Swiss-Prot record:
AMMECR1 domain segment(s): 1-191
PROSITE patterns: AMMECR1 (PS51112)
Pfam families in the cross-refs: AMMECR1 (PF01871)
Name of this protein: Protein aq_1444
Length: 195
């Protein structure tokens, strides 16, 4: 797998949206990235590295090529926390792609949850009723959170009280992610070490 192809595919999709052009993905690329996989696209300003958009497909329900196109378009234009990306910003943002493993529910006593979470490896999904929140593995590393803080902030992301992870009705899932980011816009793509 050449992750640069996925970053370029995401950029291509967003550029074509700016231009009002159809997104045509070559059959060879569709075939190469046909495996279903969860993926998130994160856009960051350059050189500040401030979040500019982040949306993805957490479950492996789409082929990787499609999930990359979809998440790139969503991160650029549909993240409700930000105004849609403007054409003049296109060469001032970094593309980051996170490839996800399928989530696994942690079925341990609630008080043991923090010791099951490995910062720098795991991302979290908290689910209670209809409410769900997800934070990628890189988030607690960037903010210096402990496993308990990671659980609390994921609860808040779900719109729930920060200690909801202790409730017996709450489900906690972990997943792993490989993070790849451009060093500079349109530049070399490298794997991000989360440890």
């Amino acid at each position: 797998m050449d992750i640069r192809e996925l970053v370029h595919l995401g950029r291509y999709a967003v550029w074509n949206a700016f231009e009002g052009k159809e997104i045509k993905v070559p059959e060879a690329l569709k075939e190469k990235y046909s495996r279903n996989m969860g993926v998130f696209t994160t856009l960051k300003t350059y050189p500040e590295h401030n979040l500019r958009g982040c949306i993805g497909v957490p479950l492996p329900v789409y082929p990787l090529w499609y999930a990359t196109v979809y998440s790139s378009l969503q991160a650029a234009f549909q993240d409700p926390r930000f105004y849609p990306l403007k054409k003049e910003e296109f060469d001032k943002v970094l593309w980051e792609i996170t490839l996800l493993t399928p989530p696994e529910e942690l079925k341990v006593p609630k008080e043991e949850l923090p010791e099951q979470i490995e910062i720098g490896k795991h991302g979290l999904i908290i689910e209670k009723g209809e409410q769900k929140g997800l934070l990628l593995p890189q988030v607690p590393v960037e903010y210096g959170w402990s496993p308990v803080e990671f659980l609390e902030y994921t609860c808040l992301k779900a719109g729930l009280p920060k200690d909801c992870w202790k409730d017996k009705e709450t489900k906690v899932y972990v997943f792993s992610g490989e993070v790849y980011q451009e060093k500079e816009p349109f530049g070399e793509v490298e794997r991000v070490n989360l440890k």
